Amino acid sequence: MKAFSYIFLLLFLVIMSSCDDSLKNPVTTNNNGLGTSNPEASVCMTLASLSYVNENNPAYMKDSLKIQLAKTNYATQGKWILDWGPALSPDGGNMMYAVKDTSVNPYSYAIAVRGTDWCFPFNWKEDLGAVEFDPYPYGGTGDSISHGALVGLNYLLAMTDTSTGKSLVTYLNSISSQHPDSTKSSMFITGHSLGGMLATVLSAWFLDVGYSSKFELTTYTFAAPSAGNQQFVQHYTNIFNSADALSYRVVNPNDLVPYFYGDLADVIVGQIPTTLPYVVDAVILAMDAYFIKYDLIYVQAGILNTLPSATPTDCTYPSGSLDQYECYVAFNHHTSTYLSLLGAPQTEYGDTPCKWEQR
């Protein structure tokens, strides 16, 4: 099993870590997008995008995040203020923060989890941890999530605000005590890419430990790979239904990442997002066969919301080449593309490559 993880590493390092939409492809679509009818999704995607603020400069992260949240030209309209965090894992690979909207009564809250940062090898472990299942510790027998998802969840729960030292649990308990028992505040949990996958398991934890008694939860994930098996997803669905909570999985149909890890065959059948190079085709076939052989059957959680597709205008490499494929993958997965497809204003920050990734 460990040997096969190197195939994952090869695929992700060859394709994902070198995928940089440095050409700044404009989004070409005739559809106004989900965001025109769902401002919640636009706000959550904006918060997810801002989780990448100064990801390689943690000393400036908090101040930069406050500046970005204050901007009135974003979908967040300057209404959301930093209330907890940013919190970082020891190696800096994971980041999470919480905000509140004081323009409504009771206040609304949101937790945003950062996606994959290829500058931090620990993120590779969380992405590549899909090669084995671990029991989901807050569910029942048979509820399993990827090893990477469990590692990531444990990190999120252990992380503390870089200024106050408060954990997420301490923060949630604090704001819970500020409201009467009869009043529930809205809580949003969101993330993009790996952040979306971690937002899924964090949302399950949130309900499983009883926070639905204080908050009305709505989860929005964007471009998220799947987190667990069918039993976990059934548990996820049950606890959301019991809590009268909502979970939306927002995807660009031409984004490669949401097909991981349960719909890999569809990547080949649909040539997602464009003509697959032979090496990518071969590795995905091998990965799919491996998951089937070892009964690692992944299922996506949440209500599917499919965005309109978009076409990059500056990916002009030969069809079937690795360069062309990387260009399409980067464009379709980027936070700026998701914001555009939602009809939301662009942010100044989003998922960006490390210096060593730039070509």
Residue ranges of model-derived segments:
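N-terminal low-complexity, Ser/Thr- and acidic-residue-enriched intrinsically disordered segments
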Residues: 23-104, 114
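Lipolytic serine-hydrolase domain surface
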Residues: 233-359
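Short, solvent-exposed loop/turn elements at domain surfaces
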Residues: 55-57, 119-122, 258-259
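Serine-dependent carboxylesterase/thioesterase catalytic core
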Residues: 173-260, 264
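A conserved cap/lid and substrate-binding interface adjacent to the catalytic center
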Residues: 82-190, 210-216, 244
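Surface-exposed intrinsically disordered loops and tails
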Residues: 58-87, 133-175, 271-285, 289-290, ...
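Bacterial Sec-dependent N-terminal signal peptides
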Residues: 3, 9, 13-36
